[in-house]
């Protein structure tokens, strides 16, 4: 294995970390309705916990309203309860076989909590990136010990790993900044 292969293999993992972070912050509430808001909601259905999106369609009715069209009429009650109990500050209302979820405006205090949560997710993601960088450097040093590569190539590989880390940390910082603006927007 070469340094380039080590870097490429781990760059794919770094990209996955960024994608996971994007998915994580997409579920954080802003003032607008988004289907990602209900991604983590689990419904007690057919004897097991299932994601809400597996028991019905979730759509955006308008800027402040989500609509959940439940496929099985018997699941309306449990789905409504799951949304209410998800600690998202939402109050769902059942209307026949669908559930209307109004997104109330965020209070200043709640906005600050969501900003803190966004930053926490960002820090967790950065730790994950740093761990991947550490793994890359260990693999590169192992290659040098096995005499597969020379010291110059090892140093170049470490430099590439650092540059890659900084590139992805910068992306996370930009995503955090963008999400904070979105949350604080009234």
From Swiss-Prot:
The gene is frr. GO terms for cellular component: cytoplasm. Disulfide bonds: none annotated. It is found in: Cytoplasm. It comes from the Bacteria. It comes from Chlorobium phaeovibrioides (strain DSM 265 / 1930) (Prosthecochloris vibrioformis (strain DSM 265)). SUPFAM superfamilies: Ribosome recycling factor, RRF. InterPro entries: Ribosome_recyc_fac, Ribosome_recyc_fac_dom, RRF_sf. GO terms for biological process: translational termination. Responsible for the release of ribosomes from messenger RNA at the termination of protein biosynthesis. May increase the efficiency of translation by recycling ribosomes from one round of translation to another. One of its GO terms (molecular function) is ribosomal large subunit binding. NCBIfam families: frr. CDD domains: RRF. Belongs to the RRF family. This is Ribosome-recycling factor. Keywords: Cytoplasm, Protein biosynthesis.
